[in-house]
Amino acid sequence: MGELPPNSVGVFLALLLCSCSLIELTRAQSPILEIYPKQEVQRKPVGKPLILTCRPTVPEPSLVADLQWKDNRNNTILPKPNGRNQPPMYTETLPGESLALMITSLSVEMGGKYYCTASYANTEILEKGVTIKTYVAITWTNAPENQYPTLGQDYVVMCEVKADPNPTIDWLRNGDPIRTTNDKYVVQTNGLLIRNVQESDEGIYTCRAAVIETGELLERTIRVEVFIQPEIISLPTNLEAVEGKPFAANCTARGKPVPEISWIRDATQLNVATADRFQVNPQTGLVTISSVSQDDYGTYTCLAKNRAGVVDQKTKLNVLVRPQIYELYNVTGARTKEIAITCRAKGRPAPAITFRRWGTQEEYTNGQQDDDPRIILEPNFDEERGESTGTLRISNAERSDDGLYQCIARNKGADAYKTGHITVEFAPDFSHMKELPPVFSWEQRKANLSCLAMGIPNATIEWHWNGRKIKDLYDTNLKIVGTGPRSDLIVHPVTRQYYSGYKCIATNIHGTAEHDMQLKEARVPDFVSEAKPSQLTATTMTFDIRGPSTELGLPILAYSVQYKEALNPDWSTAYNRSWSPDSPYIVEGLRPQTEYSFRFAARNQVGLGNWGVNQQQSTPRRSAPEEPKPLHNPVQHDKEEPVVVSPYSDHFELRWGVPADNGEPIDRYQIKYCPGVKISGTWTELENSCNTVEVMETTSFEMTQLVGNTYYRIELKAHNAIGYSSPASIIMKTTRGIDVIQVAERQVFSSAAIVGIAIGGVLLLLFVVDLLCCITVHMGVMATMCRKAKRSPSEIDDEAKLGSGQLVKEPPPSPLPLPPPVKLGGSPMSTPLDEKEPLRTPTGSIKQNSTIEFDGRFVHSRSGEIIGKNSAV
């Protein structure tokens, strides 16, 4: 073709532009249907809701009719019916003449071609299609966010994903990709395999899923914590509990998480936590039984359970049943025969049984006894039933085997005791009565002959006299009281024929025994064999008395003496004195330098015997007192001199008895005590260290300010008007005196110094108070003295003129008129050794009889006749 002219090209372009505008206008005016969203292919995830809107684009919307949707099977989709039921797919008219396709939950089956159709002006059919393509979004079907593998095992960290198209999976640990080049981690379709899980494998794992076609990416965070299977680390194989007592046992387990522990009784498969008396702590595994029963015996299983697994271990509970003696009978056997006593007990374990005599601690051993082969202990055990038997056999039994026996049942739980009695029967026996004295009677007094027969069983007793049974004599003077085992024969000896022998005969099933008894006539004692003076003083006389040479049955109850002055021939006026046989025979109240006559007799139950052993004895003249006797018990070691030990270190109380005054009353005592030492057994006094004191009217003296752990020789002398007695001497030792040393260290001042300081302090305080009163208020002793010192002479004269004109000073009241002290024997400190001259009577005085007596405390002077102390018979 040739080239067009330039104006032709412009015309062509104008024509082309007009044609396009015409075509566009034509299209705008033609009716169509539009579907929103406008994409012809809609990709939507399964399970999600979907809405598609069909809108007519026509010149006249009112000419549109039959607007509807058709599904992928070309079925008309109906509108939603009335009510709550909602179909999976329905249509709904929207404002603006639009029709919406509503899909509540998209499924794979709903994918396909959908059409929207309508008619326009009843002449033209309108249709618009849209394709719905479904896909499955990434969905975690099995991917828990917390997963717990077990230590030492292989574990798959689950991460199951559902998606369409299929996703790709990769793993991260603590934010870092996991390398699968080694055998530790293996990616599987259902998760991540971890081989031989260790605690170091714990952490945060990320399961990441991606769909390339859809560009979807989703992550799942999984926390992995390694669990450890339970392990029982402490449970004894055997447990022991005591019946009736509380019990506790531990089943200790470890694991992760902390395992829960339970106890199962194998016999019943019962969890003991639900049983009575049982308590279980599931955290610590402690099982407690408030009171163990014998039925609790058996095997128990300890279960330790956590999310990693279960482990169990068995143990046996042995119940120690305390022994119980359920049979022990008293037994009886005859002498010389065999006797066996059996004790039966139960317990777990079966108790050991032994015996012992009541009141002793020694137990019999199994088998024959070493110290007594007659006794054998036979034990027997039944462990299955928990029972034991012990038999104590005594062959050739003796009377000494009779008595109480204690059965002892013993096991680990405790001891049980029960007492039984073995009775050994024997024939009557009178051996205990062979040493009894005869029975005495006198003056027809009734006598009691008692017969006691020892025997088991009790014996019956008969009395015989002169070969005949007394019960057959019908003698009213013979009365039998009791027939056994004790029987008394009351004899009324109205004539001498009843003073004779009687026979007691005892009988039981094992034999007979006889015992002879004598009834004798008693008489008064015979003459006293001897009575001689052993000690003479001016006022006392001590005798040694030997009883009658022959004793006529009854014992001596007392010795009597009659004494009178020898010049007096009448015994009816004599003095009487009696002594018990075990007392000193001392006659007191005698006159010095006087001769006396004495006679003696013995007394028993019958009466006083005849007087005899007549003798005369003179008392010596007045003299110094007898030697006083200290009332202390000395202690003698080996051959050394006896020593009296003081319980104190710094003082000692000397006590003595009042000696005989020998005719003159004792007026004082002289005590001399000297410290000393023993050198080679010889007593040596310390020079210039002796103390001498004299005391009156007392029989004790306390020596003070002594030195601890020191020997003292003490001499005691009594004094009367004649002189001093011979000295009584003892050696005394004080204790160590630790307490005295402690007191000396602490005590700075003596008691007198402390009292003086206290009085001085009080006086000083009074002086200060008086001085203050004088200065402040012009009162007090000092103020009064000052006022008197300042008075003028005229004031003094005026004061003197008051009253009677002079001051009268009354004399003090005279003391009570007391008699002057009586001086006995001259100066109290004089020490006459003997009587130089007789006593002189002052001129003009009347001579009267007088007595001076000393009763141990006071001196009494009496005038008049001297009367003896004892009454005359």
From Swiss-Prot:
It comes from the Eukaryota. Residues 29-751 are extracellular. The modification Phosphoserine is found at S827, S845. InterPro entries: FN3_dom, FN3_sf, Ig-like_dom, Ig-like_dom_sf, Ig-like_fold, Ig_I-set, Ig_sub, Ig_sub2. Disulfide bonds join C54-C116, C159-C207, C251-C302, C343-C407, C451-C504. The keyword Ubl conjugation does not apply. GO terms for molecular function: cell-cell adhesion mediator activity. GO terms for biological process: axon guidance; axonal fasciculation; behavioral response to ethanol; Bolwig's organ morphogenesis; cell morphogenesis involved in neuron differentiation; dendrite self-avoidance; homophilic cell adhesion via plasma membrane adhesion molecules; imaginal disc development. Glycans are attached at N74, N250, N330, N448, N458, N576. Keywords: Cell adhesion, Cell membrane, Developmental protein, Differentiation, Disulfide bond, Glycoprotein, GPI-anchor, Immunoglobulin domain, Lipoprotein, Membrane, Neurogenesis, Phosphoprotein, Repeat, Signal, Transmembrane, Transmembrane helix. One of its GO terms (cellular component) is postsynaptic membrane. Residues 1-28 form the signal peptide. Neuronal recognition molecule for the MP1 axon pathway, pathway recognition for axons during the development of nerve fascicles. PANTHER family: CTX-RELATED TYPE I TRANSMEMBRANE PROTEIN, FASCILIN 2-LIKE PROTEIN. This is Fasciclin-2. It comes from Drosophila melanogaster (Fruit fly). The gene is Fas2.
